[in-house]
Amino acid sequence: MAGHSHWAGIKHKKGKADKQRSKIFSKLSKEITVAAKLGDKDPAMNPRLRSAVQAARSANMPKDNIERAIDKSSAATGANFENLRYEGFGPEKIAVIVETLTDNKNRTASNIRTIFQKSGGSLGTQGSASHNFQQLGIIKIDKKEISDEKILDLAIESGADECFSYEEHHEIQCQMSEIYNVKKNLEKIIVNFISTEIEWVPLNSVEVNKDNKDSIVDFLETLEEDDDVQNVYSNVSLGGI
């Protein structure tokens, strides 16, 4: 498997600019509400909700916002959201997977298709791009929690398959069926986690023409900015950008 580098298969996230803050909170709130609606409202008893709350805290979402999102799941009325996945190919034929959470699949499909078309890419059918990826459990830990030297041994002892250290965080990879067992083992040492999620990791990363890097980044960021989009994955490698 290719290394899960910063740009290869990264789940492109927003948050670099303050103006993105409200969008991040909106997406996190939606995920918290849906997770609470589908399961127990106690994060300790609901793995999906626990992961959503964990991500919200890592993004510095106020506690009141988190509690309101959970309470919203109990409302008698409200939109019914569904998870939908779109696959396609962007500039230079990079493979892309877009995960959405929507209350209007026609609107979402139209928006995603338009973004792909404007980039010179195309939206494909289910399975058209995902065969370039594998789903793995991804656990991210702030580097303040543990050193580079200690995290590798801990990851192996906890049942993980891979461990990578980046500038600000450690990333532990495992089989998706084992993610909560691995995390439970990590919790014997680690207190604060950035996120615990199932992600699409590329089997191989694809190098692209340096002249097209900016347009590819713009394409991926435009996908991210759609209100219905939760996660964007690609198999592109953009070097040091």
Segments predicted by a language model, with ranges:
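N-terminal cationic and glycine-rich segments that engage phosphates or anionic surfaces
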Residues: M1-G124, A129-I138, E178
